[in-house]
Every structure is written in structure tokens, then in C-alpha cells.
A protein has these predicted regions:
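Short, contiguous alpha-helical
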Residues: 1-29, 68-127
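Helix-adjacent hinge/juxtasegments
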Residues: 16-17, 21-58
Length: 127
């Protein structure tokens, strides 16, 4: 659950920083009402929708403004969209490895996973 929350909170932070023109590194605490994976997914869906609308309204000038990220990077705001994407990809990969170790089925992420291919074969096999 902590990793899932990290993914959505970090993405929200990246988008908020791009919009504001400066990153705020204050913790984004998981709301008490967000206690399950389903809750996290719902929170993400709602926040992404708002963030996407706001990002879509940014001007070219805002998107090329150079933003500092913890003194580690100084990139145009638009570059942090890609940075955020790669951050999310990295952690989704982590989540997928945890699923199998916990006995879960790994869903299709980029093309079929072994588990999704097996499920597809099983669905096509007459019983």
C-alpha cells in the first residue's frame, strides 16, 4: 500500500510543481479515507483528472520555464512530465514483482504478462 500511495502522491506532486512553477516537497499524506488499493486508485483517478485539465491549460511559456528539483535537476517544466512517467513506470514494475511473490497474478502492463497470457489461453480452451 505504501508503494501504491507513493506512486500516486509523487505523480500529483510532479504535476502540481509543473503547474505552480515550483516544487513543494511537503509530505502528501494519505487521507484517512484512502485505506485500500481501490481507494488509492479512485483518489488517483480524481486527482489525475483535475491535474490533466490544469496541465492542458498551461502556456508554452509556463512549460519551458526551468524548474529546480531539489538542487539535483534544472529542467524545463515540460521535461518533468517525462520524468514523472519514468518514475511511475519504475515503481509499477516494482509492484508487479511484488504481486507474484505474494501469490497474485501479474496483469498486462506493456503487452501480455505470463499470467494474462495463461488466463487468455484458459478462456479459449473449451471445458
Amino acid at each position: 500500500m505504501e508503494l501504491a500511495w507513493h506512486i500516486v502522491a509523487a505523480e500529483h506532486r510532479f504535476y502540481g510543481g509543473i503547474v505552480a512553477g515550483v516544487f513543494d516537497f511537503a509530505p502528501i499524506h494519505q487521507p484517512e479515507t484512502v485505506g485500500t488499493a481501490r481507494d488509492i486508485a479512485q483518489w488517483y483517478g480524481q486527482s489525475f483528472e483535475r491535474n490533466f485539465r490544469t496541465l492542458a491549460e498551461l502556456s508554452g511559456e509556463q512549460l519551458v520555464k526551468v524548474l529546480d528539483f531539489r538542487g539535483l535537476f534544472r529542467l524545463p517544466a515540460v521535461a518533468y512530465l517525462n520524468f514523472s512517467l519514468h518514475h511511475t513506470i519504475h515503481h509499477r514494475g516494482q509492484l508487479s514483482t511484488y504481486l507474484r511473490a505474494m501469490g497474485g497474478k501479474v496483469p498486462s502492463i506493456y503487452g501480455e504478462s505470463h499470467d494474462s497470457a495463461e488466463a487468455k489461453k484458459a478462456a479459449q480452451t473449451p471445458t
